[in-house]
Amino acid sequence: MGRAMRVVVVGGKKVGKTAILRQVACVEDVTNKPYEPTIEDTYQVLLEEPDKAREILILHDTAGVSNYGPIELKKAYVQAADAFVLVYSSADYESFNRVDLLKKWIDRQFGKDKKEVPIVVLANMRDRPATVDSAFAHSWAAREKVKLFEVTAKDRQSLVDFIHYVGHRHFHPTKESKFSLSKKLKSEKSSNPAILMDF
């Protein structure tokens, strides 16, 4: 038996959410097939490492959010999510604006409960001429404290890093130290420095 996490994948219409998930979970390139709007779907990805329990990512594919009007996700997605993956097309600036609004909406929902939910952003269609500048997007991601990956649904290898990042962040979180050595604690005369440990 393995451990599972639920990842909700959201973004505007026609940004390639389903194409990304089909490539990751089914090893199928659907980028050349006619566009079919997604209502919702679920995919599973198994992460396996020797001598470790199986880890399963349950990826929830959602209908594309409208390019106009207020942002809102189904309550069931918000309640179930262990992480969010926000997708925009680097060839469509409006889809980037919607991701910015989605990020702020998610922050407001989880800010009420003081709960931190990881958010990863995918800049899809990196193989097309970009209208969203890469440096601008990375600057935005740093300011919003999210991890940004530039990917293309045509290339499965470009998608591997974000899957491993999401899984590792959930199943193997690193403990951030709450203490730091200040200058007052460091003795210049002592040849045997003390070590502070975070428990």
UniProtKB/Swiss-Prot annotation:
PROSITE patterns: RAB. Keywords: GTP-binding, Nucleotide-binding. Belongs to the small GTPase superfamily. Ras family. KappaB-Ras subfamily. A motif (Effector region) lies at residues 35-43. One of its GO terms (molecular function) is GTPase activating protein binding. GO terms for biological process: negative regulation of canonical NF-kappaB signal transduction; Ral protein signal transduction. This is NF-kappa-B inhibitor-interacting Ras-like protein. Disulfide bonds: none annotated. Residues 1-199 are annotated as: Small GTPase-like. PANTHER family: NF-KAPPA-B INHIBITOR-INTERACTING RAS-LIKE PROTEIN. The keyword Nucleotide-binding applies. In contrast to other members of the Ras family, the members of the KappaB-Ras subfamily do not contain the conserved Gly and Gln residues in positions 13 and 65, which are replaced by Lys and Val residues, respectively, and are therefore similar to the constitutively active forms of oncogenic forms of Ras. This suggests that members of this family are clearly different from other small GTPases proteins. Pfam families: Ras. NCBIfam families: small_GTP (TIGR00231). GTP binds at residues 11-18, 61-65, 124-127. It comes from the Eukaryota. Atypical Ras-like protein that may act as a regulator of NF-kappa-B activity.
